[in-house]
Amino acid sequence: MVLLRVLILLLSWAAGMGGQYGNPLNKYIRHYEGLSYNVDSLHQKHQRAKRAVSHEDQFLRLDFHAHGRHFNLRMKRDTSLFSDEFKVETSNKVLDYDTSHIYTGHIYGEEGSFSHGSVIDGRFEGFIQTRGGTFYVEPAERYIKDRTLPFHSVIYHEDDINYPHKYGPQGGCADHSVFERMRKYQMTGVEEVTQIPQEEHAANGPELLRKKRTTSAEKNTCQLYIQTDHLFFKYYGTREAVIAQISSHVKAIDTIYQTTDFSGIRNISFMVKRIRINTTADEKDPTNPFRFPNIGVEKFLELNSEQNHDDYCLAYVFTDRDFDDGVLGLAWVGAPSGSSGGICEKSKLYSDGKKKSLNTGIITVQNYGSHVPPKVSHITFAHEVGHNFGSPHDSGTECTPGESKNLGQKENGNYIMYARATSGDKLNNNKFSLCSIRNISQVLEKKRNNCFVESGQPICGNGMVEQGEECDCGYSDQCKDECCFDANQPEGRKCKLKPGKQCSPSQGPCCTAQCAFKSKSEKCRDDSDCAREGICNGFTALCPASDPKPNFTDCNRHTQVCINGQCAGSICEKYGLEECTCASSDGKDDKELCHVCCMKKMDPSTCASTGSVQWSRHFSGRTITLQPGSPCNDFRGYCDVFMRCRLVDADGPLARLKKAIFSPELYENIAEWIVAHWWAVLLMGIALIMLMAGFIKICSVHTPSSNPKLPPPKPLPGTLKRRRPPQPIQQPQRQRPRESYQMGHMRR
């Protein structure tokens, strides 16, 4: 009982540490909101954009309100992620696949914003980068199986992702012993003479080196071959959803690598050249190397490496498997010389007599029985590709500031290539350290000319103001404003402002059709629960950031409060309380299970509904209810639209028994008990050995042996002997000759 109280206090303290989170989605996502915009309308817009001829119709607009702010997304089909020769391969055919459901864009009028995702069946899924951080949008049924929900999608902020970054010995990456085995294996590759690039011969010395740098200046794109196994397809369900997940991962790492300066090598990008999708129909296909359900992470990487990937910069396999020790990914580490592996590596013979391509890696989206949030998977992908690019794990005080005793450095966190997974919310978590940059720069200088290709530059005429452009109103038959030169103009003029014009409406909502900045009093953004309306400042076309409303302003229909401009805090915090969960085990009425409940800090015994007499001085008897779809009754059910807690037991008793037996927490508790009571384990071990020795000693003298030199076995004392009843004496009969008996028997 004491242990139970301590556990409750610890859980309450953990809730207090993240007190602003009041609507958890699962054990990794502490707060979310539902989205219920019109999917039919968005689907129709997508169909129009897909076959659009006019410039205006090529854009897909999506407006919704969530987390105390307004999202006005303006997106266009993303063609930068797929090469001109892009193919999708299935078990029986190769397709020229339509990727028109993949979009990229921004929040209209918000400088520095960015969005990427897909539109499938009228629903947007992807991520949205804003000034206040990144939001992730996913289908609701991926987390909540109740189909009567009043919303179809969920949206959550990156700060609400609570990923336990100490899982596994290396927190998502294989341990040192695995990498050491891989390193030794990489050293055994047999180099073919024809594979040595001509420019590596130093016959012409510095002159050749200068020429190499010049010719490779635009070769900055790594082309990918990505396969997905049948388990990955089974989780996401459709071919479109699988391709959307791949594009989301590639876009995420593309953003990280493009913004990193690798010692003068800039704008490193990624492009998908080919995708192989193994569907559930390939689960028993003997030609599918990934068909077996129980494959270790090293073997899984080896199966990928046994294929020939000479046509690609890197080749990855995405899966939905729960690998041992919490491993989320594994990849071969590249090197500038001396060993095989990493980017641009060609298939060659190794010490085990097999030809392999070591420009490979693998990624899984499952960890300890649960699916990780997209952000965690994106960072894992960036980490493993970092290995391919030549970076080992960060080490030393310079490159592991998160381990520093200096609080200022520690606050910034560790970098991408840190040995253990990072929480993702620190300044350095999405950056490469100086150690990684030095290592990657050496590999890029040596190898990128072997397989990298030229990337597409910003496109004048796509309606988006990109780097090097002043404005972008489209081509001559599309451009409707008088402020910007269209894309049909000669170089030096196209996508530039016309003389004497201050701005173009393509730059943002604070520019008039007369090419002048709007006055300071004009509104460019509606106010939201937690932010005031946006007002033009009179000297830029972009809509300035809105001022946040005071902290603890009610938002989200008075169920939450504003914190620093975000609708993220619980209404309980407004009165110095903490949010708690009303559970039936505490004697709460069934009607209270879907109420917002509050308690005094660190005192779970005071947990009560906002409509209770206990908190009437704060809420005046007003009952605040949870949103439909919110977890209730201590995560044993979900609130329906009638504010009733519907219990969910989708797994059944057998699945619960399996989870109880194979739960990692069970074995962690056993391991902790063994460490704490090692002496008891030692005594039990000695007792077991003595018991076995005594058993063998006692029973060995009664055990018969075929060895004639050993004494005969002793009879067991007190053994009961069975008495046979007397048999009648029979007269002996004359036996037939053996030969006739055998022949007669054979004839029968």
Curated annotation (Swiss-Prot):
Keywords in alphabetical order: Alzheimer disease, Amyloidosis, Cell junction, Cell membrane, Cell projection, Cleavage on pair of basic residues, Cytoplasm, Cytoplasmic vesicle, Disease variant, Disulfide bond, Glycoprotein, Golgi apparatus, Hydrolase, Membrane, Metal-binding, Metalloprotease, Neurodegeneration, Notch signaling pathway, Phosphoprotein, Protease, SH3-binding, Signal, Transmembrane, Transmembrane helix, Zinc, Zymogen
Topology, Extracellular side: 20-672
Alphabetized SMART domains for the sequence: DISIN
Glycosylated position list: N267, N278, N439, N551
Motif Cysteine switch mapped to chain: 171-178
Localization (cell): Cell membrane; Golgi apparatus membrane; Cytoplasmic vesicle, Clathrin-coated vesicle; Cell projection, Axon
Name of this protein: Disintegrin and metalloproteinase domain-containing protein 10
Phenotype when changing E384A: Loss of proteolytic activity. Abrogates APP cleavage. Reduces Notch signaling
Record-listed Zn(2+) binding positions: C173, H383, H387, H393
Segment forming the signal sequence: 1-19
Catalytic activity: Endopeptidase of broad specificity
Domain remark from Swiss-Prot or TrEMBL: The propeptide keeps the metalloprotease in a latent form via a cysteine switch mechanism. This mechanism may be mediated by a highly conserved cysteine (Cys-173) in the propeptide, which interacts and neutralizes the zinc-coordinating HEXGHXXGXXHD catalytic core of the metalloprotease domain. The dissociation of the cysteine from the zinc ion upon the activation-peptide release activates the enzyme. The Cys-rich region C-terminal to the disintegrin domain functions as a substrate-recognition module, it recognizes the EFNA5-EPHA3 complex but not the individual proteins. Both Cys-rich and stalk region are necessary for interaction with TSPAN5, TSPAN10, TSPAN14, TSPAN17, TSPAN33. Stalk region is sufficient for interaction with TSPAN15.
Impact upon substituting R181G: In AD18; associated with disease susceptibility; significantly attenuates alpha-secretase activity of the enzyme; shifts APP processing toward beta-secretase-mediated cleavage resulting in enhanced amyloid-beta plaque load and reactive gliosis
Short motif (SH3-binding): ranges: 708-715, 722-728
Stated role: Transmembrane metalloprotease which mediates the ectodomain shedding of a myriad of transmembrane proteins, including adhesion proteins, growth factor precursors and cytokines being essential for development and tissue homeostasis. Associates with six members of the tetraspanin superfamily TspanC8 which regulate its exit from the endoplasmic reticulum and its substrate selectivity. Cleaves the membrane-bound precursor of TNF-alpha at '76-Ala-|-Val-77' to its mature soluble form. Responsible for the proteolytical release of soluble JAM3 from endothelial cells surface.
Membrane-topology annotation of the record: Single-pass type I membrane protein
Disulfide bonds: C222-C313, C344-C451, C399-C435, C460-C495, C471-C484, C473-C479, C483-C515, C503-C511, C510-C536, C524-C543, C530-C562, C555-C567, C572-C598, C580-C607, C582-C597, C594-C639, C632-C645
Region span, Disordered: 704-748
Biological-process GO terms, alphabetical: adherens junction organization; amyloid precursor protein catabolic process; cell-cell signaling; cochlea development; constitutive protein ectodomain proteolysis; epidermal growth factor receptor ligand maturation; extracellular matrix disassembly; in utero embryonic development
Membrane topology (Cytoplasmic): 694-748
Post-translation changes: The precursor is cleaved by furin and PCSK7.
Site label Cleavage, positions: R213, T214
Clinical condition linked: Reticulate acropigmentation of Kitamura: A rare cutaneous pigmentation disorder characterized by reticulate, slightly depressed, sharply demarcated brown macules without hypopigmentation, affecting the dorsa of the hands and feet and appearing in the first or second decade of life. The macules gradually darken and extend to the proximal regions of the extremities. The manifestations tend to progress until middle age, after which progression of the eruptions stops. The pigmentary augmentation is found on the flexor aspects of the wrists, neck, patella and olecranon. Alzheimer disease 18: A late-onset form of Alzheimer disease. Alzheimer disease is a neurodegenerative disorder characterized by progressive dementia, loss of cognitive abilities, and deposition of fibrillar amyloid proteins as intraneuronal neurofibrillary tangles, extracellular amyloid plaques and vascular amyloid deposits. The major constituents of these plaques are neurotoxic amyloid-beta protein 40 and amyloid-beta protein 42, that are produced by the proteolysis of the transmembrane APP protein.
UniProt region (Interaction with AP2A1, AP2A2 and AP2M1), positions on chain: 734-748
Propeptide segments, given as residue ranges: 20-213
